[in-house]
């Protein structure tokens, strides 16, 4: 069976930007002082890469793992340093129930490999050749965007179930000014992505990091797509979180940037209400979203107590309207949010 991934997207796994070009054995673990884990050695047939290609290989001698930040269906994320700089390392697990989906997730993360924007988590380096200790399909070193996600800010340090589950305690109070600041960060990131022909397709609070400078950065591009790629092949599998998935995607219609606008509207609603979007069984929610235009309630006091609150409600409603073509673009959404921010002074 031919590989589902085009050859042009294969990383040069036999290369590493090492200071020398000596061949060596498989990478090994070297315990460092203070209990940190250093990864020594370089892959076989290692050669020095030109600087312009340094992003598509990892110098494992410069990696120091600090702690595991979390784990998901496709692997684990670690806090680490790379060349002495704080980073996050995502390891795509080899032992998953759906290996093909794991491979797709790895390559999707690299859709943003050469992009730079203040509100997008930057890819520093990536490789399909990893130390044996990881037992992974591939590794991606990313900018360390922060220890906190927007999900944790909204729902508290312990987080909150994204699907059905017990009630959660809210996090810190997010006033309208803070909601708008974070919204402008996120939409600025979306505008840049869409201008590059990329759709995220899994935008939600858990995938938005907040840096020490209080800047939101969009992360986790494992479901992302390049629009130009979709012209040549259908998208058979739609990942992402069902509570934030646009109704046209649930119906199998074409992917457009407007799907991210829908997800943002749900996210903005979460910021302003600090509630979970839906309760009830997943299949019932999916059916109601498509067949009956089910949306989260807009009855919260924040939408009725002031003129700015009412305008925020209008922005949310426009963002999650069912006909995708009627939703605003990221550019128009950014203008509306800036106007509302100016109104608040």
Curated annotation (Swiss-Prot):
Protein name: Proto-oncogene serine/threonine-protein kinase mos
GO CC annotation, single: cytoplasm
Function: Serine/threonine kinase involved in the regulation of MAPK signaling. Is an activator of the ERK1/2 signaling cascade playing an essential role in the stimulation of oocyte maturation.
Family in the record: Belongs to the protein kinase superfamily. Ser/Thr protein kinase family.
Organism: Sus scrofa
Subcellular localization: Cytoplasm
Binding-site residues for ATP, renumbered to this chain: 69-77, 90
SMART domains noted in UniProt: S_TKc (SM00220)
InterPro entries: Kinase-like_dom_sf, Prot_kinase_dom, Protein_kinase_ATP_BS, Ser/Thr_kinase_AS, Ser/Thr_Kinases-Pseudokinases
Keyword vocabulary terms for this entry: ATP-binding, Cytoplasm, Kinase, Nucleotide-binding, Proto-oncogene, Serine/threonine-protein kinase, Transferase
Tissue: Restricted to gonadal tissues.
Pfam family, one: Pkinase
Gene3D superfamilies: Phosphorylase Kinase, domain 1, Transferase(Phosphotransferase) domain 1
